[in-house]
């Protein structure tokens, strides 16, 4: 129970942090204040118009997905971190996930008769 709570909290908290980090947050992104992204989503890499709209912008769900895949794979999957702060934040998230997993497994082994 406790490990699952930490796991879900890790995903949500880091999803919010990724959303707030990228280009200064959602309001700064909308205003176009910072043209340099912290994350490179596949839709931003010149994919054909049949795959992504030309005006596509990441939403909170996209950052939550990045958080989920980072925890599950312990690495970036389709969305690459570009800035040092994005890389550090993803590293911290994966470290928290691995540490939680190790502690839960150690506790489970410890309670065996």
What are these model-predicted stretches?
Residues 1-27:
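Pore-domain transmembrane helices of cation channels
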Residues 57-113:
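Pore domain of cation channels
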Residues 22-78:
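Membrane-proximal soluble regions of multi-pass membrane proteins
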């Amino acid at each position: 129970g406790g490990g699952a709570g930490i796991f879900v909290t890790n995903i949500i908290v880091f999803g919010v942090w990724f959303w707030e980090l990228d280009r200064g947050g959602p309001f700064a992104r909308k205003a176009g204040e910072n043209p340099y992204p912290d994350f490179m989503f596949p839709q931003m890499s010149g994919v054909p118009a049949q795959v992504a709209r030309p005006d596509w912008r990441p939403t909170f769900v996209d950052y939550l997905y990045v958080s989920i895949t980072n925890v599950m794979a312990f690495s970036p999957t389709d969305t690459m971190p570009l800035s040092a702060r994005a890389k550090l934040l993803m590293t911290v998230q994966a470290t928290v996930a691995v540490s939680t997993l190790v502690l839960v497994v150690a506790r489970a082994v410890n309670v065996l008769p």
